[in-house]
Amino acid sequence: VVAHTGNPGQVNYTASKAAISGMVKSLALELSTRNITVNSVAPGFIQSNMTDKLNDDQKNTILDRIPMKKLGDSTDIAKAVGFLCSENANYITGQTLHVNGGLALI
C-alpha cells in the first residue's frame, strides 16, 4: 500500500515497495515475448502475529482507515496469488493487485 500512498517516517520502506512495482513492470515488458506474465500483490493490513501485538487504540486507528472496516487474513492474499497464477489471469501482466479492503483508495 505505502508504495502508492507514501508513509511519513518510512521513506526506506516505501521506496523498497515502490521498487517492486517498477521491477514488476520492467520484467513484464521483458518477458512478455515469452508469454510469461509478471504481477505483484500488495497486501494491506493482514491479521498476523504482528497485528495481534497492537493495542485496541492502534487497531481502531487502522480500522478507521480501511473502508471495509476489517483486517484481511492470509487466505485473502493466497486467493489473490492463486488467481494471478491461474489461466484466468493469462492476459494480466505488469500489474499490482491491491488486497487491502479499500485502504489504498483513501
Locations of regions flagged by a protein language model:
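Active-site "substrate specificity/gating" loop of NAD(P)-dependent dehydrogenases
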Residues: 1-10, 32
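Short, flexible catalytic-loop segment of classical short-chain dehydrogenase/reductase
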Residues: 4, 21, 38-53
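Short C-terminal tail/terminal secondary-structure segment
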Residues: 5, 82, 93-106
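Catalytic tyrosine of NAD(P)H-dependent dehydrogenase/reductases that use a Tyr as the general acid/base
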Residues: 13, 21, 91
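Active-site helix of classical SDR
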Residues: 16, 24
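Alpha-helical segment proximal to the catalytic Tyr-Lys
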Residues: 29-33, 90
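A glycine/serine/threonine-rich, flexible loop-to-helix segment
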Residues: 33, 45-66
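A conserved structural motif in NAD(P)-dependent oxidoreductases
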Residues: 66-77, 88
